[in-house]
């Protein structure tokens, strides 16, 4: 095991036995959702993973150790004000200080890969921000997807982003974007961005075969499995886009950027939509967790079926 890695006994036992495990990020606790919805949702996500046959492994940094699998007390600790938001660049700094931090998509992928977890469920990936031509703001999640072999089950990229440019970036870096039950890339709060995906999977087994084919071929890097928000929870596309545009304009006027930008935008969206964005966010998180668990189950089964038997020892030649 890696020096900085601490795997919860339940997760370690599942991995050793080849049982399905789903990685979960922790920034939704510290930055993504307000209290008390943050802890309630994190626990509900873990329950959704279990209900669909897999073991949840929420990931964070605590006391300078990457923790793979948390208990309720750990989650409560992450909800404390001032918890750091940890992406790839931040991991060495937080680990070296022995500090705490909640992991983004990128950092969660790194930890999942170190632990041997193939499937990670989250709300939405980061991507190319609107106005990138002046800000240069591109999420580290995209480069992580290009290099780290973990499948990310999500409702597309966060609605605050430039979706066409995000998909172009993923195409350039060779990251397959697969629609789960859809031919269109989801737009987070609503089901159809009007942009096509690279391929479609209609069952967990279909998705598992894509994962298996890519990695058995030796192609490093992740896969985006894009799952539309449940229809009953989706927001009206025009209203959601109007709220996003207003929030982005307010951020630009206020000079909000860097790590503070996404939490600011999500908070403003909650206000501008009268709380509807928070309800939608929770619904898609739970749905993605359930789908991710079913894909993890199918992938674990497929790995067992396709694992080659160990080569028998060479037979001894008779001696005369």
UniProtKB/Swiss-Prot annotation:
SUPFAM superfamilies: Indigoidine synthase A-like (SSF110581)
Active-site residues, as the UniProt record annotates them: 25 (proton donor), 158 (nucleophile)
Entry's Gene Ontology molecular function annotations: hydrolase activity, acting on glycosyl bonds; metal ion binding; pseudouridylate synthase activity
Catalysed reactions, as listed in the record: D-ribose 5-phosphate + uracil = psi-UMP + H2O
Binding annotation for Mn(2+): 137
Residues annotated as binding substrate: 85, 105, 139-141
Required cofactor(s): Mn(2+)
Keywords: Glycosidase, Hydrolase, Lyase, Manganese, Metal-binding
GO cellular component: cytoplasm
Recorded superkingdom: Bacteria
Pfam family, one: Indigoidine_A
E.C. code: 4.2.1.70
UniProt keyword Lipid metabolism present: no
Gene Ontology terms describing biological process: nucleobase catabolic process
Cofactor binding summary note: Binds 1 Mn(2+) ion per subunit.
Gene3D superfamilies: Indigoidine synthase domain (3.40.1790.10)
Entries under InterPro entries matching the protein: Indigdn_synthA-like, PsuG
Entry keyword annotation includes Manganese: yes
Job of this protein: Catalyzes the reversible cleavage of pseudouridine 5'-phosphate (PsiMP) to ribose 5-phosphate and uracil. Functions biologically in the cleavage direction, as part of a pseudouridine degradation pathway.
Oligomeric and partner information: Homotrimer.
Record family assignment: Belongs to the pseudouridine-5'-phosphate glycosidase family.
Protein name, as recorded: Pseudouridine-5'-phosphate glycosidase
Native source species: Rhodospirillum centenum (strain ATCC 51521 / SW)
Lineage summary: Bacteria, Pseudomonadati, Pseudomonadota, Alphaproteobacteria, Rhodospirillales
Gene: psuG
